[in-house]
Amino acid sequence: MKYSQNKSLNTFEIEYKIANKAVQIKSSGKMGVITKELKLKESVIQANNTYYLKNHGDSRIIIGTMKQQIQGVLAGFCIELKLVGLGYVVHKVGNTLVLDVGYSHYRSCVIPVDVVVKLEGSQIILYSINKEKVTTFASLLKTFKKVNMYKGTGILGINQIIKLKKGKVR
């Protein structure tokens, strides 16, 4: 099946194929093409040229995935992280991100294929049309230096607010 919408700025197209216990969704727009296959808990029933899902949860999964794909191919997803701490530095070497976040050695990770990384001072800007990949990569970067609740240092989201704990009272 194929669905397309054509307005002045928002142009996208969705194709989907339904098998016994799987749905393959392909979205395309001005930013690119995303293809994802979802495994279903129950099988799909076809009656009178209409598809029915036995499990209501499966239909919510498909709707949510289609919404994410439409937003991704129209505008994309952007996540901003900031390094807070004395001497915390990040460098981009080829397709690898190298972080110096207070350990005796550098921490490095490979940038996924669909994710674009831009560095501005102590900020890391991640951009992709695939929400799953960009959020997974951002959470991986956050695990390299967790937030210190007493000092407020670490790798944070740009709008993340930290409530500092009280230190020892002497």
Swiss-Prot record:
Location in or out of the cell: Mitochondrion
Top-level division of the source organism's lineage: Eukaryota
MF annotations from Gene Ontology: rRNA binding; structural constituent of ribosome
An example Gene Ontology CC term for this record: mitochondrial large ribosomal subunit
GO-annotated biological processes: translation
UniProt cross-references to SUPFAM superfamilies, sorted A to Z: Ribosomal protein L6
UniProt entry keywords in alphabetical sequence: Mitochondrion, Ribonucleoprotein, Ribosomal protein
Principal place of residence: mitochondrion
Membership in a protein family: Belongs to the universal ribosomal protein uL6 family.
PANTHER family, per the entry: 60S/50S RIBOSOMAL PROTEIN L6/L9 (PTHR11655), LARGE RIBOSOMAL SUBUNIT PROTEIN UL6M (PTHR11655:SF14)
Annotated protein name in UniProt: Large ribosomal subunit protein uL6m
Lineage start: Eukaryota, Amoebozoa, Evosea, Eumycetozoa, Dictyostelia
